[in-house]
């Protein structure tokens, strides 16, 4: 397995990660024992990075990972994602970021991520969707940086839209994401 640093100042993680969408049941019925076996196999082969999200089985994926990691001693980094408030997906460039990611909602959502993953601090939290138009009004990222300073998040980022992955470059330059 090859390893690299996660983000600009992050810890070393495996270049191959475990994508946990399927273990949440979003792709159909999934036996929890099969999910645990898949996680065990990945970690046994050197994987140290797991990607999940609030929306993967309505938090089921996170809960499985949180319970599973209690039985392992490896240093594993978990990246999870918080969705915006209900509305058009992906968000329209004309919608207000403050309505889709208000501070109260972000804080409540982060508390649920912490509970599901059975941890006191999230390794990586991504906003689960983004639009380039929000680059000029990054209030949600500023809120996440404040929550990071409080110790509830170690690294902040965004899940970029497939059609506009370069929208993140400006945010990286401005230090709003890790």
Q: Where would I find each of the regions flagged by the language model?
A:
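Structural motif corresponding to the early beta-alpha repeats
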Residues: 71-101
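Glycine-rich, positively charged active-site loop/lid region within alpha/beta enzyme cores that binds
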Residues: 12-14, 22, 26, 88-95, ...
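Short acidic capping loops at alpha-helix termini that bridge into adjacent secondary structure
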Residues: 14-15, 73-76, 80, 120-124, ...
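Glycine/proline-rich, positively charged
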Residues: 89-178
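N-terminal binding-site loop/beta-alpha segment at the start of enzyme catalytic domains
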Residues: 1-77
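Short glycine-rich, flexible loops that bind phosphorylated cofactors or substrates
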Residues: 25-26, 58-59, 87, 134, ...
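Hydrophobic positions in alpha-helices of CheY-like receiver
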Residues: 69, 82, 144-147
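Active-site beta-loop-alpha junctions enriched in small/polar residues
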Residues: 21-23, 53-55, 81-85, 127-130, ...
